[in-house]
């Protein structure tokens, strides 16, 4: 994976509807959305709307991916805004119309997204007008002062690129032997942190131009506890996270079996960084134009917590489930790097490793950070 190569054409959640698709494995994001919904509702209620304001409100979901989670988010926003407008209009049905922009990289499965939307509204009245906007949210996507509400859910942990320093063979920042940064050398983590900071500031600068004064920006992203030097908060979760132990072992299996060279393995890095609340606040402060209304740390339980005893009776099914979950988020970029055949072999080995995982009885938790901000 060349660091200079844009990820825009390959980075996406796995499309389609098979067992490894994002649609079939989005229970993790669904849990995150459920936990953040009260805060999202409060954030949307804080928007300043007055009688006689614009005839329609514009909402953007950035990094929308595909599936029911996408629609759940925007439906929450539209529902809350509708109730707020009804109060302003004295309890009558508001005449306000809503326009929703679903935006993600061009590699996203927009066909599946809008096919699902058509099925969802078939036979019922559509609550909003919908449009797709392909492109990176690290760049401008909309005209100046165009949007009233912007949400981005479980997307900002993905970086615009793998840091170039990490790809410099022999340098202190070279991530030799690993495909992510959990447990990596300090210099590797620092390179990722630098890239993550640059990306977040660019994201905020773009949204500052696009959101109207008084508009709302709501961000939910993978995070880590304040003061933690590790990307994953606790040892048990670190061992079971889909990006860590099993992934490294599966790549090493390909090397040990002579299917790829070590250099090939060392050239792949997952472009993800989990920020702290302090890192996020610093970027917002440096960018300007936004006032943070609330920040909240959320701890999400893995969907398999509490089911370990049952799963031990069928370890092969457990292994396939874990491999499918990993593929839902990683298969497109792995396949762009390795090709279909080696990608299939990699995740087969991932499934075998997961089935034999002695950490199966341990619980796993994910840290998320929710931030609501107002454009000032």
Swiss-Prot record:
One of the Pfam families matching this protein, by short name: Methyltransf_7
Gene Ontology MF term list: gibberellin A9 carboxyl methyltransferase activity; gibberellin carboxyl-O-methyltransferase activity; metal ion binding; S-adenosylmethionine-dependent methyltransferase activity
Gene name of the encoded protein: GAMT1
Regulation acting on activity, per entry: Up-regulated by K(+) and NH(4+), down-regulated by Zn(2+), Cu(2+), Fe(2+) and Fe(3+).
The EC number(s) this enzyme carries: 2.1.1.275
The name this protein goes by in its record: Gibberellic acid methyltransferase 1
Superkingdom in the source lineage: Eukaryota
Source organism: Arabidopsis thaliana
Keyword hit for Transmembrane: no
